[in-house]
Regions:
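N-terminal leader segment of winged-helix/HTH proteins
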Residues: 1-25
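Pre-recognition alpha-helix immediately N-terminal to the DNA-recognition helix
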Residues: 6, 13, 33-37, 97, ...
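N-terminal helix-turn-helix DNA-binding core of bacterial DNA-binding proteins
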Residues: 19-58
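Short polar/acidic secondary-structure junctions
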Residues: 40, 80-81, 154, 179
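Canonical helix-turn-helix DNA-binding module
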Residues: 43-87
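Charged, amphipathic alpha-helical coiled-coil/dimerization segments
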Residues: 70-120
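Terminal interaction helix/tail motif
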Residues: 101-144, 148-150
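Mid-protein regulatory/catalytic core that forms ligand/cofactor-binding pockets
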Residues: 132-215
Length: 215
């Protein structure tokens, strides 16, 4: 128990990088969290309601955050291709530049990167297990990476198709939204995520897809 408590205390200290008073580089912590999430989220999750759920805010608060980010030219709204009544939030090039240069968690990312690949993988997997226990205990679901989701499936002949530019493509399908998912999108966050119990099989498909996409 003392070891577990020490580990939790260290996590709390690390969290200070993204929870803070006032603002940093013109944005408050929740505004940074929103910009960061929208930059990493897939097209199904870049909506005002999904954003509100992710940052733990009301829709009214999330709407105000979106307006703030829009006023700084960090976000733009575009009609959804899946549902014309909805909008999708897109991070602009200026928003990406702000994240790359000023995101308060960048120094945490650099510190984790410095651990090396093996240590980084162990840390990620340990944190994932902790979140799994928390999700089960509180009957909740957190946003996570598309590639680990039970709704991701290989789409038709997908692997090995040839695109217009002559490169091989890899296609997947989201069974929840009944929509195609590109290989690049499988690395993005989704708020409708449910973890798969068949991850090795999915990883095998994705490894083949990456090889195909590289020609």
């Amino acid at each position: 128990m003392p070891l577990a408590r020490e580990a939790v205390e260290l996590l709390v200290q690390a969290a200070r990088a993204w929870y803070f008073e006032g603002n940093q580089h013109g944005l408050r912590d929740r505004e940074w969290m929103a910009l960061r999430f929208l930059h990493r989220a897939n097209r199904f999750s870049r909506t005002p309601s999904a954003l509100a759920g992710f940052i733990g805010a009301t829709r009214a608060t999330a709407s105000q955050i979106v307006k703030t980010l829009e006023s700084k030219s960090f976000l733009v709204r575009k009609p959804s291709h899946e549902d014309k009544r909805s909008v999708v939030l897109h991070v602009t090039a200026q928003g990406e530049k702000c994240l790359n240069q000023h995101d308060p968690i960048n120094h945490v990312l650099n510190a984790v990167t410095a651990l090396g690949t093996d240590e980084c993988l162990r840390l990620r997997d340990s944190l994932r297990e902790i979140l799994n226990h928390l999700d089960a205990a509180h009957q909740r679901l957190d946003a996570s990476i598309c590639r680990d989701c039970m709704f991701l499936a290989e789409r038709g002949p997908g692997i090995g198709q040839v695109a217009a530019k002559g490169r091989a493509t890899a296609e997947f399908m989201c069974r929840l939204y009944r929509a195609p998912v590109s290989l690049e999108e499988t690395e993005l966050l989704c708020t409708s995520f449910e973890r798969t119990r068949d991850r090795p099989k999915i990883e095998e498909h994705l490894d083949r897809a990456r090889v195909a996409s590289q020609g």
